[in-house]
Amino acid sequence: GISADQAKALKDDIAVVAQNPNGCGKALFIKMFEMNPGWVEKFPAWKGKSLDEIKASDKITNHGGKVINELANWINNINSASGILKSQGTAHKGRSIGIEYFENVLPVIDATFAQQMGGAYTAAMKDALKAAWTGVIVPGMKAGY
């Protein structure tokens, strides 16, 4: 698990991001495809499309919003999220999205939060996100693979 201070920092963090889930989610996917261009092939709706085409898609905004809301759910329930995380692992395995994508996406989330929050994204929040991601979220999802 993570400490009470880390949980609080994470909840403060996601509270800011969750005020604009669609905008932040879209930014997250754009950043993900900028940092990992090959990952777009894992998304049937965007496979073979340019980043500009993806940016113009309503689907990126809608799916991005769902992802941010789900991430908020994980974070707000971080110390009791094992069931949610396991089911998300199983769901993503069923879509042929391996756990390695989740193991390697933290730099994307970190960069997106920094971009979206600016100076409000503190070192404590960054450290808490890393601790939660590597110590709770990825292991929880692995249980579903």
Curated annotation (Swiss-Prot):
GO molecular function, one term: metal ion binding
Residue ranges that the Swiss-Prot or TrEMBL entry lists as coiled coil: none
Signal peptide: none
Alphabetized UniProt keyword annotations: Heme, Iron, Metal-binding, Muscle protein, Oxygen transport, Transport
Annotated positions binding heme b: 63, 92
Domain Globin: from-to ranges: 1-145
PROSITE patterns assigned: GLOBIN (PS01033)
Cross-referenced CDD domains: Mb-like (cd01040)
Assigned protein family: Belongs to the globin family.
Subunit and partners: Monomer.
UniProt protein name: Globin-1
Source organism: Liolophura japonica (Chiton)
